A protein has these predicted regions:
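Structured, charged N-terminal subsegments at the starts of enzyme catalytic cores
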Residues: 2-7
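Binding-interface segments
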Residues: 8-215
């Protein structure tokens, strides 16, 4: 990296960190955050994400701040390790991408769910789908993942508060089609690249939530 590029990156970092630590940003975050999240912690996590993903330093400051505030409004953690939500650079804009754990969190808040299970299906698993009177899934796996083979699909299975149940299954080809529609899916720092299984789970959860008319 050339000297002037280093200086420019350092300047962006200083400006963004100053914004995140400013009284105006902290006040705004306190206005939108739920009680279980603290503005200072969110700012600290955002700064850590900037250090871990320097491409974020090239994003427009307003788009970055907007993505952080949006995550706060949703009550989602932006720590990429936790998988609730991700800050993803695309060109010079920062996008907020909700992970499957974040999608589950939003769905659970609806009050319509008792629980939701999300699993990958591998080629050597004993897996069956039944519709009609015996509507449901049957999924048995081998104890060692090395014996299960390659991933062939994913499912989300919801137990509803009204006593009902509903599931959605997507094979790997369907997941890949959804991935291809994401503008930043092939970027090296996209969660589709760094957390592919989590993003696939998020995709099937999101589709099921649409059928259930839940908030995600």
């Amino acid at each position: 990296m050339k000297t002037n590029q280093v200086k420019k990156s350092s300047s962006f970092h200083t400006n963004i960190v100053s914004v995140l630590n400013s009284d105006a940003f902290q006040t705004r975050m306190r206005q939108v955050l739920p009680d279980f999240l603290r503005a200072e912690r969110i700012a600290g996590i955002a700064i850590t994400e900037l250090r871990n993903n320097p491409k974020l330093l090239q994003c427009d400051v307003l788009s970055l701040v907007g993505a952080i505030i949006r995550a706060g409004q949703l009550g989602l953690d932006i720590d990429s390790i936790k998988g609730h939500a991700y800050l993803v650079p695309y060109k010079n804009e920062c996008q907020l991408i909700i992970g499957y754990k974040g999608m589950l969190t939003l769905a659970n808040r609806s009050g319509k769910l008792l629980s939701m299970e999300v699993q990958e299906v591998r080629e050597n698993d004993d897996f069956e789908i039944e519709h009609g009177d015996n509507y449901g899934l049957r999924h048995k796996i081998k104890p060692r993942r090395s014996e299960r083979g390659s991933i062939i699909g994913f499912y989300a299975y919801a137990h509803l508060a009204n006593g009902g149940k509903m599931f959605e299954y997507m094979d790997q080809d369907e997941i890949n089609e959804i991935k291809a529609c994401s503008k930043s899916s092939n970027s090296y720092n996209s969660p589709w690249v760094t957390f592919p299984i989590e993003m696939a789970k998020k995709t099937v959860v999101r589709r099921l939530c649409k059928y259930l008319a839940l908030s995600p």
